[in-house]
C-alpha cells in the first residue's frame, strides 16, 4: 500500500480524546483504488459439503467514495424502533457548499402512516446453511418473523437485542450469475437491488431504548446499530466464517453509521468504515475518534450523506426533515446546528491488498491506532 496522508483532526478542539462526545462526524478523502473478491459459485448450500468459490479475477474499484459508491443495503439491530427512513441521491452535493446539488428522494418509509415507497424489508428467518448461515426472507410486520411476501414494518415496532432487519430497494434482481446485475446470490432468497449512487444520503428517525426484554447473556446485548453493507454481502452470507462466501473480508465495503460497539459504552454511538483505506485490519476498521450520545428515552433524527468530493458526514439533529426534495443548504445547516463535530481524513491508498480473514462481530471496542494515538499526544503536548 501507498499511504500519502493520514491525519486525524477536530473542527472544534485541537486536543481530541477518543471518547469525545459530538453530534456530527466527518470522514474526508473517502474513496480509493483497490480490489475485492466476488463470489462466483455457491455449491450444495444445504449439505455438509457446502462450499463457495470466488472469481479468480478480483473486482477492481476506484474513485470518490469507493467502494461505498456501489449499491448498499441498510441494516438495523435492536433494541431499536424505526419511525422513518429515506434514501436520496444528488448530482453534485458538496458538504459545506450551499449552492451545490440538491437531494432527490428515492425511497421512503413512515411507520405512523404505513407509507412505503421503494423499500423492501427483509430479515434472517430463512433456512440455515453450514457455510452461509441463515438466509434472508421477507420480514413480517414485526421486522423479524418470516413473511410470504413484501410487508411493511408496523408502527412503533421494537426489535430487541441481537434482532436485525434490513432494507433494500423494491427493484428485484435478475437471475443469479456472476456477470448479472446482482451477481451470485442464494437461489431461495427474495433478492433485491440495494441503494445506488456515489453521492447518496440516508435519513433516519429512530429510538434506541434501553434493553429490558432479553437476557444479558445474549449476543450484542443492548448494542443497537444502524449500518450499511455492500449489497452483495447479505445476498450471499452476512455472517459466514468462510472467507469465500462473501466479499466482506476482502473489502467490498461497510459503513457503520450509528453503532454501540460494546455493552460498557452503551450510551456511545460510533461511526466506523470497514474497508482497507488506511487500515489493514478490516474488523477494527477506521473509526472516528468520537461518539454521538445515544438517547435512551427520546427520538433521534439524523443520517449520513456521502458527497461528490469524498466527504461522508454523520449527524443527529432535530431539524432533519424527510422532504421529497432537500436543498444542499438544508443538509449543511443540519450538520452545523448539530454543534460540536470531529473530522477524520482517510489515507490516500493505491494498490490495496486484501489478505485478512477476520470477521466483523459484536462487542468490539474502538481502539485508536498507534499513529492516531501518537498524533493526539503530540497535539496535546503542543497545546500545553
Swiss-Prot record:
The lineage of its organism: Eukaryota, Fungi, Dikarya, Ascomycota, Saccharomycotina. Belongs to the PGA52 family. Residues 1-17 form the signal peptide. Residues 362-384 form a propeptide. It catalyses: Hydrolysis of (1->3)-beta-D-glucosidic linkages in (1->3)-beta-D-glucans. A motif (ExDxxE motif) lies at residues 254-259. It is found in: Cell membrane. This is Probable circularly permuted 1,3-beta-glucanase PGA52. Induction: Expression is induced by fluconazole and repressed by CAP2/HAP43. One of its GO terms (molecular function) is hydrolase activity, acting on glycosyl bonds. It comes from Candida albicans (strain SC5314 / ATCC MYA-2876).
Amino acid at each position: 500500500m501507498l499511504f500519502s496522508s493520514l491525519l486525524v483532526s477536530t473542527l472544534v478542539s485541537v486536543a481530541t480524546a477518543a471518547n469525545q462526545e459530538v453530534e456530527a462526524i466527518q470522514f474526508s478523502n473517502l474513496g480509493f483504488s483497490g480490489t475485492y473478491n466476488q463470489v462466483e459459485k455457491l455449491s450444495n448450500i444445504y449439505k455438509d459439503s457446502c462450499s463457495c468459490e470466488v472469481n479468480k479475477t478480483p473486482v477492481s474499484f476506484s474513485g470518490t467514495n469507493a467502494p461505498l459508491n456501489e449499491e448498499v443495503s441498510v441494516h438495523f439491530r435492536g433494541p431499536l424502533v424505526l419511525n422513518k427512513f429515506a434514501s436520496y441521491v444528488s448530482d453534485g452535493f458538496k458538504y459545506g457548499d450551499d449552492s451545490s446539488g440538491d437531494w432527490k428522494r428515492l425511497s421512503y418509509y413512515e411507520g405512523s402512516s404505513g407509507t412505503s415507497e421503494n423499500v423492501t424489508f427483509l430479515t434472517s428467518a430463512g433456512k440455515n446453511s453450514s457455510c452461509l448461515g441463515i438466509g434472508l426472507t421477507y420480514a413480517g410486520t414485526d421486522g423479524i418473523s418470516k413473511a410470504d411476501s413484501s410487508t411493511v414494518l408496523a408502527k412503533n415496532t421494537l426489535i430487541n437485542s441481537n434482532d436485525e432487519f434490513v432494507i433494500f430497494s423494491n427493484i428485484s434482481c435478475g437471475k443469479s450469475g456472476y456477470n448479472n446485475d446482482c451477481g451470485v446470490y442464494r437461489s431461495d432468497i427474495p433478492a433485491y437491488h440495494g441503494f445506488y449512487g456515489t453521492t447518496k444520503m440516508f435519513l433516519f428517525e429512530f429510538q434506541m431504548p434501553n434493553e429490558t426484554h432479553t437476557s444479558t447473556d445474549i449476543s450484542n446485548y443492548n448494542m443497537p446499530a444502524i449500518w450499511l453493507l455492500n449489497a452483495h454481502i447479505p445476498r450471499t452470507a452476512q455472517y459466514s466464517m468462510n472467507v469465500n462466501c462473501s466479499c466482506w473480508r476482502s473489502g467490498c465495503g461497510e459503513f457503520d453509521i450509528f453503532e454501540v460497539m460494546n455493552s460498557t459504552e452503551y450510551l456511545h454511538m460510533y461511526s466506523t468504515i470497514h474497508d482497507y483505506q488506511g487500515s489493514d485490519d478490516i474488523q477494527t476498521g477506521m473509526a472516528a475518534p468520537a461518539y454521538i450520545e445515544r438517547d435512551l428515552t427520546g427520538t433521534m433524527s439524523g443520517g449520513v450523506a456521502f458527497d461528490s468530493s469524498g466527504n461522508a458526514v454523520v449527524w443527529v439533529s432535530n431539524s432533519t426533515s424527510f422532504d421529497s426534495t432537500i436543498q444542499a443548504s438544508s443538509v449543511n445547516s443540519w450538520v452545523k446546528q448539530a454543534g460540536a463535530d470531529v473530522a477524520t481524513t482517510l489515507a490516500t491508498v493505491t494498490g490495496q491488498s486484501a489478505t485478512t480473514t477476520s470477521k466483523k462481530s459484536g462487542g468490539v471496542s474502538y481502539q485508536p491506532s498507534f499513529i492516531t494515538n501518537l498524533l493526539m499526544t503530540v497535539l496535546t503536548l503542543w497545546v500545553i
